[in-house]
Amino acid sequence: MSDNSKIRVVVGMSGGVDSSVTALLLKEQGYDVIGIFMKNWDDTDEFGVCTATEDYKDVAAVADQIGIPYYSVNFEKEYWDRVFEYFLAEYRAGRTPNPDVMCNKEIKFKAFLDYALTLGADYVATGHYAQVKRDQDGLVHMLRGKDNNKDQTYFLSQLSQEQLQKTMFPLGHLEKPEVRAIAERAGLATAKKKDSTGICFIGEKNFKEFLSQYLPAQPGRMMTLEGRDMGQHAGLMYYTIGQRGGLGIGGQHGGDNEPWFVVGKDLSQNILYVGQGFYHDNLMSTSLDASQVHFTKEMPEEFTMECTAKFRYRQPDSKVTVTVKGDKAVVNFDKPQRAITPGQGVVFYDGDECLGGGLIDRAYKNGQVLQYI
């Protein structure tokens, strides 16, 4: 049996149950484990309590329980420069960004990995629900987590082969209830802590309120694609393609009582387009353009492949044909897709293997671009 005690694994510990169990399992498997708490955002909750301080206390309690050293490292500047500025720029451009994808790419598997290597790490580990499979020739494949409901490969799709080579996902073969049960059996301080929701730096706060602190809202006209005035919107950045709530128009307009949805945006004119019906014609597209396309292993500069794709988290896979040129791709859908949203990720799969992905730029219907920006 190999001696794991000579293999140093640095675990990103958030103060949550998933990363706590990650550290516990690695320690039980005999690895030389170090816990690191990343402080990425300077924040207090509505009661004036610094949430990072509370989370760090939980990390300290768990690390003491399982007997591993732990440290805190501050990545606030890197986070602001590499994730938050991107997040704001995307909203300014009328898009709907996915900061978790960028946070994994730039912070958890870049800034954190670089820091871990200075501590002599052989690997880093996180509490993500994903799996890595290592070939004999050293190539690493990223597979979906066993818990379909928790699988996080969508958010990890921008990781490189070099990053995956250095990564372990000890929870990948477990389902969430099993992870909680392990934490409770071990009496970990975080066993009953509820999962965090929302964007990492916003936490539980009101999204609209938070965004308006950084981007001035520009109210404008809300109308149908036929040109009928439907009142005023609060600012394009507050709406995403396919959204239903928050429009304030109910069923009072139009002959039928079908609900209203965001069906388009015109950033240059500051117009929000709305229409009735979940499957409104303007919400259905047949292809998309993506940029920043990246694969987890080396691929040819230009190629075409058939695979499946996700266009948002927790969505069932859809069959697609992908034509790649450099870091751009055209993705044609076997069946029309609803609410393909610029700024979100498109992620490619071959069975359970996550191949990589890109960021959605434009959606098309039978070759015609849909006005989503």
Curated annotation (Swiss-Prot):
The active site is at residues 103, 200. Coiled coil: none annotated. ATP binds at residues 12-19, 38, 127. It comes from Streptococcus sanguinis (strain SK36). This is tRNA-specific 2-thiouridylase MnmA. InterPro entries: MnmA-like, MnmA-like_C, MnmA-like_central, MnmA-like_central_sf, Rossmann-like_a/b/a_fold. It is found in: Cytoplasm. Residues 98-100 are annotated as: Interaction with target base in tRNA. Disulfide bonds join 103-200. It catalyses: S-sulfanyl-L-cysteinyl-[protein] + uridine(34) in tRNA + AH2 + ATP = 2-thiouridine(34) in tRNA + L-cysteinyl-[protein] + A + AMP + diphosphate + H(+).
